[in-house]
Amino acid sequence: MSVFTPVSPAQLTDWLQRYDLGTLVALQGISEGVQNSNFFVDTEDARHVLTLFEKVDSTLLPFYLDLMAHLAGHGIPCPAPRPARDGSLLGTLNGRPAALFSRLSGASVMHPTSAHCAAIGRAMAQLHLAGSTFPAPPHPRGADWIAATAARVMSILSAGDAAMLAAELSCQRDHTATLPGGVIHADLFRDNVLFTDGSTPCIGGLLDF
């Protein structure tokens, strides 16, 4: 169940005043998911998904929302944040950080074929290319963190273990120095990919980065 914080039609109607999306037509909780409260929201103008972020570090949300907007703007079928009238992508609803996204089409495929996997591979390649132009911050567990953590433990290691760790760090630095970098999905599995109906698998949505 992924409605941890309930939202009433009256509360949502008031919150939607910050958007130019018309009158609220329908509100329905979404049962899938384990971290956030999600709702299908229909207004006069379009269909949306409302997310109330329950467990996410709120300082990371601007990066996430800007990334989704960037990828959607480059043709990636991911949830596009709906900007409010003042241009903001993030608000607060019932004490939770909240955002409104485009509603994507399709459904998850529980028994994918090789054709589905090929479509996902193409989508990931497109995502990586689009993400390569997005200014991502340093990874919290990246090279700087690895070097700092290794330095803290070196003094408590035996000479042999310290030498082995130093050799591995050097090997990793040499290996990763020439690799491309950029944003990735990082949580890709069947539930997070939507396929539209058709004789050829076509991805309608990539979810929950």
Where are these regions (language model features)?
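Short secondary-structure capping/turn micro-motifs that flank functional sites
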Residues: 32, 87-88, 143-144
